């Protein structure tokens, strides 16, 4: 009877049930063992601090990983020179081992090293005093009384991991401080927080600050945070267990005086209570404490290893694995001795129905109003059971009860049946994942599938996916990636993988091909990539495998120019130039894109090579010209050489425009040589490379009018352009006298408006007034007068021209009343 196994502790009911008879041959008394939560594997290693009788089995130190049922998953010989300071599991069932030299090693369940990193030279030099590992990080305390934190181990898998130095301790510890970690998901700061007992005071330390939490009367020897993150169990030097709140709101903590002189192993049982374990005495004992007077003692006949779960505690010994947890309310309602709950009556009614007793009908009638609740309770109770027979009885009771209900929604019943079928499959001794229903709902089906495939239980994972009607591509992908590391011949293995996966949607053949290539199976990898439907996934592995031609074909077929560019860049880096160009010239699209890429990157040598092969003189000329213009002005010899090469290729072209271009380049050579001469004579290195206009302008501003005139004559600069350049330069120099002289040399070919404009640009209205009268066009002359505020002069011109519209324009701009009156008089006279 189920209730016979229960133990009443305070106001709650608990049960310690055997889940497995362990398959291993392990003496936990001589081993260090750590179990992964959520029914995870157990890592075992010989305890180097204990004397062990040597035999053939333990001559060498081994790291062994077992399932929760004690089946060996993997093992490896451990290098005894690597001194371990901490070993524990993090999420995704990864085993973390921290060494004394500050090296961190990460292993999967097959003892395969996934990655490693260092905590840094400073940590190594200060020496690790103590280290604690949490679900995604590490915290170490050094001999220098300094804390260091790894906020995320997963970040080291993507090379973005970091080690943080935490604030210094608030006082020098007189003895080694005890501490516990509050994980980020439970802290207000959303980063790790550390509870540390130093000299009788409890402090809270985060990445930025240290705060005092509690003035304790006795130093704390052990402390541990509950799975929910809300409670902190502390065991002090007087043998008292205290339960505090992590938010600092504790006023009257729950306590238990054990009178023990030695500190126990402290482990939470879910978040309900704390299990204390003393293994250093003749008969190991467990003490469970919840609150008030709620406690219980369990005497053991062998050492155990404890693993905290969110809803209980795994108690692992040399021979058994037990699960200690609180009995659910629905289970108590159904199986408690003397119970008359509706669910209990329904459960009994089912037995009566099976035995064809008329009492079944009476029982159903008696709970008719509460039948739906009874059905739901039986469904829930089935979920809490590990025994398949008891699950079946409870589900039969629920099924029997719902037959008498109209419009009952069976979704809860169906979901529970499916969940239990999955759970029973993974709980099987050969699989060894004894998840409770609460743990299963907490991690979710995706995480469970991930755990199965990481243990290479692909068939079971696939069957679960198929049963639950969820995507199985992840399972099959991992199966194939594992398969390529076997010794099956390439051709045979290729057929096996393709036959199995070809029709499965969402499969990434690229991932499998990459795994095959890493396993040294290039031919198999190439064959598998032919079945990858996505070109973006297909091309990069082909490049990595050196299949440049195939990669180029696939990239071109995809129509994705970015992919083609990717292949071209990879080919350029890895192939000899001749092979690269031969392969590229065989594909017109690739060649066009290569030319475009070279132009964007100004890769002139490669462009010259391409155009030389294509015998395109004009393009060769363009490249040499572009190369000359883009080279630095100080490299004149190089520029001239490129100009001459350009002319040489343009001469081979039959295009008349190219012949004209040759003449322009000749002039450019002549100009740059003159500019170089100017740089030498004037000791100014900023001439070469600028235009003719800029050269003349610069010479004028440097008071070199004769040299400017010489350049003008040499290159036949038109009068209009020269006048524009000179008046601009003289105005910038504020050489108004020279500007006036220049305006009188001869009639201006550009008129006198530019003279006014440059004066006004320099905000010199007085000089501008000298040139406005010389303007012949009436409108610009009036506009300039308006611009500088000479409204009367503007009005006189408009009146002289008898232009009524211009007078109106002036009056709109003018604000002087006297002048406005004059303008009105002028307008009156014009009207007459």
UniProtKB/Swiss-Prot annotation:
<keyword id="KW-0967">Endosome</keyword>
<dbReference type="GO" id="GO:0042144">
    <property type="term" value="P:vacuole fusion, non-autophagic"/>
</dbReference>
<dbReference type="GO" id="GO:0005768">
    <property type="term" value="C:endosome"/>
</dbReference>
<dbReference type="InterPro" id="IPR006926">
    <property type="entry name" value="Vps16_N"/>
</dbReference>
<comment type="similarity">
    <text>Belongs to the VPS16 family.</text>
</comment>
<dbReference type="InterPro" id="IPR038132">
    <property type="entry name" value="Vps16_C_sf"/>
</dbReference>
<dbReference type="InterPro" id="IPR006925">
    <property type="entry name" value="Vps16_C"/>
</dbReference>
<dbReference type="GO" id="GO:0010008">
    <property type="term" value="C:endosome membrane"/>
</dbReference>
<dbReference type="GO" id="GO:0006886">
    <property type="term" value="P:intracellular protein transport"/>
</dbReference>
<keyword id="KW-0653">Protein transport</keyword>
<keyword id="KW-0813">Transport</keyword>
<dbReference type="GO" id="GO:0016192">
    <property type="term" value="P:vesicle-mediated transport"/>
</dbReference>
<dbReference type="Pfam" id="PF04841">
    <property type="entry name" value="Vps16_N"/>
</dbReference>
<dbReference type="GO" id="GO:0015629">
    <property type="term" value="C:actin cytoskeleton"/>
</dbReference>
<dbReference type="InterPro" id="IPR036322">
    <property type="entry name" value="WD40_repeat_dom_sf"/>
</dbReference>
<comment type="function">
    <text>May play a role in vesicle-mediated protein trafficking to endosomal/lysosomal compartments and in membrane docking/fusion reactions.</text>
</comment>
<protein>
    <recommendedName>
        <fullName>Vacuolar protein sorting-associated protein 16 homolog</fullName>
    </recommendedName>
</protein>
<dbReference type="InterPro" id="IPR016534">
    <property type="entry name" value="VPS16"/>
</dbReference>
<dbReference type="GO" id="GO:0016197">
    <property type="term" value="P:endosomal transport"/>
</dbReference>
<dbReference type="Pfam" id="PF04840">
    <property type="entry name" value="Vps16_C"/>
</dbReference>
<keyword id="KW-0472">Membrane</keyword>
<dbReference type="GO" id="GO:0003779">
    <property type="term" value="F:actin binding"/>
</dbReference>
<dbReference type="GO" id="GO:0030897">
    <property type="term" value="C:HOPS complex"/>
</dbReference>
